[in-house]
From Swiss-Prot:
NCBIfam families: PRK09293.1-3 (NF006779), PRK09293.1-4 (NF006780)
GO function terms (MF aspect): fructose 1,6-bisphosphate 1-phosphatase activity; magnesium ion binding
Family per similarity comment: Belongs to the FBPase class 1 family.
UniProt keyword list: Carbohydrate metabolism, Cytoplasm, Hydrolase, Magnesium, Metal-binding
Cellular localization per UniProt: Cytoplasm
Any one biological process term the GO annotation gives: sucrose biosynthetic process
Organism: Psychrobacter arcticus (strain DSM 17307 / VKM B-2377 / 273-4)
Reaction(s) the record says it catalyses: beta-D-fructose 1,6-bisphosphate + H2O = beta-D-fructose 6-phosphate + phosphate
Cofactor note text: Binds 2 magnesium ions per subunit.
Lineage: Bacteria, Pseudomonadati, Pseudomonadota, Gammaproteobacteria, Moraxellales
Pfam name, any one: FBPase_C
GO terms for cellular component: cytosol
CDD domains linked to this entry: FBPase
Protein name listed in UniProt: Fructose-1,6-bisphosphatase class 1
Amino acid sequence: MTTLAQYLNTNAASPALNDVITTVTDVGKTISQLLRKGALADILGEAGNQNVQGEDQKKLDVLANDLLLDALAKNTHCAGVASEELDDAIPANAEGSLLVLFDPLDGSSNIDINMAVGTIFSILPYQHQGKVSENSDFLQAGNQQLAAGYLLYGTSTVLALTITDNVVMFSLDPDTNDYVLIEENVTVDADTSEYAINASNYRYWRAPMQQYIDELIAGEIGVRGRDFNTRWVAAMVGDVHRILCRGGLFTYPFDTKYANKAGKLRLMYEANPMSLLIERAGGGATDAVNRILDIEPTDIHQRVPVVLGSKNEVDYVKNLHLNYAEK
């Protein structure tokens, strides 16, 4: 039985990376405990304010964010922290060598109905040790990530992590409070018959995405010649976890629902870390035209369309968009 601590000691590229991942996952234990208490800990309901994204914050959004910020500020290897919940990145320790980005509680609308939520994190190198970090230091393409992962708080608490060229999974043992390795080489099947999308936005999508979903709905009587099933957790972390476990496709495509927003999902806090996990498990991740991990960010809260999961299906969606652009 291999614990997370043992795995990191053997596989982490540096003691600094080991320590920062440990800090994040230790906070995950606290968040997991709070979620188990639910209403008994008075953590349900609205916090009464909005985040930088214009979204209403839940009480646990704020609490999870504060727990991560406080813990990382005390970590000497962390030079700065950027959160989906805050306007700007926060400097930590100028001598640190790492930057941490996170979505403290993805899918927080699920909290009050006792459904899956999670914490997503990304770790980048810091290039200016000795100087106070600022927003621009975080503007690195996803292919520069040193580590990425998520904690899924469901019927059990699961950690998915990549620090090498593969993806591993751990489960939090409630008896020992240790993360225990349960899968050491996660792979995503190239083909799938499951897809996840919020179909209520159909009228706002571009024509190739509408065509794609029309084909899936037509199933065996359409051009695809086989049936597909829809799955939707309303939390990216839950949908991506399902894909890592049994394949599938997840997309939150470009839409015109809100002006000046290319998509719903944030590049730095959601798309980049999830894309790294999916690609290293053998899947694909694109904005429907470009590889997500190659996108050069211009803002820490930049939004992008996302299509990720089983590679053959991702490639199919990308080809539909490319063919449409050539017409």
